[in-house]
């Protein structure tokens, strides 16, 4: 058993999630003061000793992403300078995860740059969830635990949707998410369908083609990320046009930027279920279709297991209560 104690600090991106995680472990959040000067520089002061402690810093990729990323880097570096034994960054929604490859001439691989910056700042370990591209783990020279929302999603479906009464089909909104959707369908013993989408430019889908049978069924769209929700809106229309009785969407990272709320409200989607890797309270007040799955239990159990040197692989298949 580790002799050093756990210290959990929260950045400004998602203090509510950090508070839930700390409460589940039976701790209070560590004292930290983050100040932004009039010239937009960020200053961080760690308000308690972290010498020889096991430090966890929670900061997710949302809102003012660049400010939050810099804040995280400074917090990590401050803890390293204060002689923390180990520093783990908990980044539920990893920033710049969609910039993971050189997909056109002179394009930067920004996800790798973020990985390098985190390590240079002094990070010893990364916890994240449903990376948009799993190969991002290879950008790090420190351990990365990429947790899955799937166990929590399975629990939500089993507790809230009676698939024996309502014939249900799991749908991937694109070919890239087929593996995720088929894994979920297999564990629930449900049918699977796929939507092929053609893009003319980023965030805009021009045409969708359905592969599979959704007629008279509840169709559940499953994806790792929903940004402007253009894909989900068009996918829901495609499913309804092909006879689906109702359409839900379950998404790990509900970024919901731009006109996303307007798109959801005007779409054929009856529910959009997102995890709380990103805060949604302001969005939920504008859209009654949005529901939230709490993943604080997964993060808390991961922290406990890492601190005590236990395996975290059980969290890939079971969601803590």
Curated annotation (Swiss-Prot):
EC number(s) from the headed UniProt entry: 2.7.6.1
Subcellular location: Cytoplasm
GO-annotated biological processes: 5-phosphoribose 1-diphosphate biosynthetic process; purine nucleotide biosynthetic process; ribonucleoside monophosphate biosynthetic process
InterPro entries in UniProt: PRib_PP_synth_CS, Pribosyltran_N, PRibTrfase_dom, PRTase-like, Rib-P_diPkinase
Alphabetically ordered keywords of this record: ATP-binding, Cytoplasm, Kinase, Magnesium, Metal-binding, Nucleotide biosynthesis, Nucleotide-binding, Phosphoprotein, Transferase
Residue positions binding Mg(2+): 130, 132, 145
A GO cellular component entry from the record: cytoplasm
Keyword ATP-binding annotated: yes
Modified residues (Phosphoserine): 172
Ranges in coiled-coil conformation: none
Family annotation (SMART domains): Pribosyltran_N
Catalytic reactions on record: D-ribose 5-phosphate + ATP = 5-phospho-alpha-D-ribose 1-diphosphate + AMP + H(+)
Gene3D superfamilies xrefs: 3.40.50.2020
GO molecular function: ATP binding; kinase activity; magnesium ion binding; ribose phosphate diphosphokinase activity
Pathway(s) where this gene product acts: Metabolic intermediate biosynthesis; 5-phospho-alpha-D-ribose 1-diphosphate biosynthesis; 5-phospho-alpha-D-ribose 1-diphosphate from D-ribose 5-phosphate (route I): step 1/1
Highest taxon of the lineage: Eukaryota
Function, as annotated: 5-phosphoribose 1-diphosphate synthase involved in nucleotide, histidine, and tryptophan biosynthesis. Active in heteromultimeric complexes with other 5-phosphoribose 1-diphosphate synthases.
Protein family per UniProt: Belongs to the ribose-phosphate pyrophosphokinase family.
PANTHER family: RIBOSE-PHOSPHATE DIPHOSPHOKINASE FAMILY MEMBER, RIBOSE-PHOSPHATE PYROPHOSPHOKINASE 2
Protein name from the UniProt record: Ribose-phosphate pyrophosphokinase 2
Annotated source species: Schizosaccharomyces pombe (strain 972 / ATCC 24843)
Taxonomic lineage from the root: Eukaryota, Fungi, Dikarya, Ascomycota, Taphrinomycotina
